């Protein structure tokens, strides 16, 4: 199934918000093979929040569910890394072009995801990294996921 077929499976409300173009790095079949659940939360996460993200991500992998997150520091990084370490699959939905790791300390993780899992962006190479990209990324993440688990978030969070 290609992205055009995937688009046809969306509801009218979902189609309204689906990005015009998506860029892929990695195994596109992850969008179609299994169930997908987003695990998201604060960049300034607590120890307890990180532990919850780890437990939930391990549990999702155990049930053959793909872990989706946004590659931000904190909860997102823990979700991706735990899925990989647990032998599962992960999808990173980026708020930057595929060639721009954000945060920079996730450069190695992004490369691993692009090689062995899937990274998705709706932003072409050369597109500037701007704060407004990240809520757009969050909407795309929700559109490709069957469910979203919010681990922890502040009142000003883009996760809300």
Language model features by range: what are they?
Residues 1-54, 58-62:
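Short, positively charged patches
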């Amino acid at each position: 199934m290609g992205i055009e077929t995937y688009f046809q499976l969306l509801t009218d409300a979902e189609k309204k918000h689906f990005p015009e173009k998506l860029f892929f790095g990695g195994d596109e079949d992850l969008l179609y093979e299994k169930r997908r659940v987003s695990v998201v939360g604060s960049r300034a996460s607590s120890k307890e929040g990180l532990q919850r993200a780890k437990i939930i991500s391990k549990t999702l992998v155990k049930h053959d569910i793909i872990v989706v997150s946004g590659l931000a520091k904190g909860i997102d990084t823990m979700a991706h890394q735990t899925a990989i370490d647990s032998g599962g699959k992960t999808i990173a939905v980026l708020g930057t072009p595929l060639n721009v790791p954000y945060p920079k300390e996730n450069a190695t993780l992004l490369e691993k995801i692009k090689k062995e899992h899937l990274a998705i962006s709706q932003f072409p190479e050369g597109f500037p990294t701007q704060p407004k990209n990240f809520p757009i990324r969050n909407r795309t993440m929700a559109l490709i996921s069957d469910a979203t688990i919010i681990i922890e978030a502040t009142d000003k969070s883009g996760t809300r």
